[in-house]
């Protein structure tokens, strides 16, 4: 552990179009090599596709997708007497959100559609209706935690 103070959390400004803090964090996560304008173009393009495909509010679809992807428990390795146990622990709210955003992006990038706009649109719609790779990842994480429930007394 570091002997210094914990680093201060930086303030994230809400995104320009919808004024949403979580969406701003998502855009920052999509961004590669500091190209924020490109990331905004991709995310807003996906939102326009969602609006035209479903007729629903894209911000609501985004938040529904994120809620369906956020994990509530995960396993962490704990070494006890020469053996390493996978101990289930509850996920902090800030980490829960970060994992949800990361998984949405990772599984959108792995999809087979041609453009990132199409991939993000597909992943948002799938996750909002409890399908897709990111939702499967959350379920696998929960399954791992459930399988290792016997080691929960090693929690720290």
From Swiss-Prot:
Keywords per UniProt: Ribonucleoprotein, Ribosomal protein, RNA-binding, rRNA-binding, tRNA-binding
Function text: One of the primary rRNA binding proteins, it binds directly to 16S rRNA where it nucleates assembly of the head domain of the 30S subunit. Is located at the subunit interface close to the decoding center, probably blocks exit of the E-site tRNA.
Its protein name is: Small ribosomal subunit protein uS7
Protein family (similarity comment): Belongs to the universal ribosomal protein uS7 family.
Which gene underlies this protein? rpsG
Its assembly, as annotated, is:
Part of the 30S ribosomal subunit. Contacts proteins S9 and S11.
Pfam families from the UniProt entry: Ribosomal_S7
Keyword tRNA-binding annotated = yes
Q: Which domain of life is it from?
A: Bacteria
Species this chain originates from: Rhodospirillum rubrum (strain ATCC 11170 / ATH 1.1.1 / DSM 467 / LMG 4362 / NCIMB 8255 / S1)
Database matches in InterPro entries: Ribosomal_uS7, Ribosomal_uS7_bac/org-type, Ribosomal_uS7_CS, Ribosomal_uS7_dom, Ribosomal_uS7_dom_sf
Q: Which CDD domains match?
A: uS7_Bacteria
* A GO term from the CC aspect: small ribosomal subunit
List the SUPFAM superfamilies hit by this protein, alphabetically.
Ribosomal protein S7
Per the record, the GO terms for biological process are: translation
GO MF annotations for this entry? rRNA binding; structural constituent of ribosome; tRNA binding
């Amino acid at each position: 552990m570091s002997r210094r103070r914990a680093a201060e959390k930086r303030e994230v400004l809400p995104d320009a179009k919808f004024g949403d803090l979580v969406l701003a964090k998502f855009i920052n996560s999509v961004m590669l090599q500091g190209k924020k304008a490109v990331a905004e173009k991709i995310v807003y393009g996906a939102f326009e596709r969602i609006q035209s495909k479903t007729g629903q509010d894209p911000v609501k679809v985004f938040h529904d997708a994120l809620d369906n992807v956020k994990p509530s428990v995960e396993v962490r390795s704990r070494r006890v007497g020469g053996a390493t146990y996978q101990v289930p622990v509850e996920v902090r709210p800030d980490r829960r959100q970060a994992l949800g955003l990361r998984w949405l992006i990772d599984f959108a990038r792995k999809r087979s559609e041609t453009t990132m706009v199409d991939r993000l649109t597909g992943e948002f719609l799938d996750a909002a209706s409890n399908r897709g790779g990111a939702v499967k990842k959350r379920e696998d994480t929960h399954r791992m935690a459930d399988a290792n429930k016997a080691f929960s007394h090693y929690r720290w």
